[in-house]
């Protein structure tokens, strides 16, 4: 097995990936705060790390993949109030919506999807340990983490703690200043503000957990004190992931994560502005899937290396659709040839080209999941494959090999080739009957009828291809 290299945000360099347990990988990816439908930017993270997970599984690793639901925080409380519902009901609605959207995008379910509200007992115990060790303190019912006590604070995001402290002091209000020992300290537990606000009993009074502590608790509970891979968007690098490290390593005394991976943003418009709910420039997956084929959206998002930005536009979506169509039509072409009764001609040429492409694919993906180079290698093979499929005598053994390989390669990107082909060709009786009538007209040299049927099929979104092996059709 060739070694996979990943870019580790903590060390700012590519490193050879070595899991704690040979053949097994523990992986935690920060999930959504479930107060609304996910937008394309949220989906980018889910798709990026699903693609990484799929490739690691393709390599033979057994991956335990944990991704949480943040089902209580300020946004949840505010949205529940605005919708005149409860936080649990709001969470349930949008957890179900998230699962529907990710299923449509063929994102594999996590091994575990823990919810913060189901881990309150563990969160309270975790916080108490930090207090006992001197890393946290109670103040007016809140509990804060002493950031400066953790000597590695700021290393993940490459920030100086003194500068962080200066920045925090400029944005802190008088009430927070009175509660905190230091402006840079962050909340582990938040006291209940209103009698009807969702809260749990704790040694410090009624309240709820802070966002950062939730992920520390859930990741270590289900994956252990040290995790192989922790992923998330670049916007989570600070303060969220920085705080996770501080909390977790202070509690356990062990390295929290061996490899930190962060995906790039989705941008929109000519100015390539970051897509976010706070900027009100987002498009939800729920809405976009009403207009865009889920496989096209999935392929578009998966075909850009995870650390790079993606510019979301109709033009870029169309480009992805065109590439996907090329793969689709090649598979349809192969299927027709494999099903016809023409003799096969075995040859080493195509088999060798497939083996070389497989090598290029894996070399690219082993290099920090370079999906662009991997897809280029596959795409460059298509003319050779199609030429063989259209030859008088095709190498059917190698065509079958390519079909199987392409299915495995594209599955890494979340594309199911059987589903892809079912959208392109099939046993639609109406179309088959029209094609049959056209063939009969051609045999009689009734070109007017033949052309009329071709035009009729074109209006139905069907493209006709006349080959030595017979007439083939695909959906546009």
Curated annotation (Swiss-Prot):
Q: Which SMART domains match?
A: DALR_2 (SM00840)
* Name of the featured protein: Cysteine--tRNA ligase
Note accompanying the cofactor annotation: Binds 1 zinc ion per subunit.
GO BP: any one term: cysteinyl-tRNA aminoacylation
Q: Which InterPro entries does the UniProt entry name for this protein?
A: Cys-tRNA-ligase (IPR015803), Cys-tRNA-synt_Ia_DALR (IPR015273), Cys-tRNA/MSH_ligase (IPR024909), CysS_C (IPR056411), Rossmann-like_a/b/a_fold (IPR014729), tRNA-synt_1_cat_dom (IPR032678), tRNAsynth_Ia_anticodon-bd (IPR009080)
- Binding-site list for Zn(2+): 30, 215, 240, 244
The family classification in the record reads: Belongs to the class-I aminoacyl-tRNA synthetase family.
Query: Residues of the signal sequence?
Result: none
Q: Which Pfam families match?
A: CysS_C (PF23493), DALR_2 (PF09190), tRNA-synt_1e (PF01406)
Which reaction is recorded as catalysed by this protein? tRNA(Cys) + L-cysteine + ATP = L-cysteinyl-tRNA(Cys) + AMP + diphosphate
Gene3D superfamilies the record matches: Cysteine-tRNA ligase, C-terminal anti-codon recognition domain, HUPs
Q: What is the lineage of its organism?
A: Bacteria, Bacillati, Bacillota, Bacilli, Lactobacillales
Residues involved in ATP binding: 277
Q: Which organism is it from?
A: Lactobacillus helveticus (strain DPC 4571)
At which positions is motif 'HIGH' region?
A: 32-42
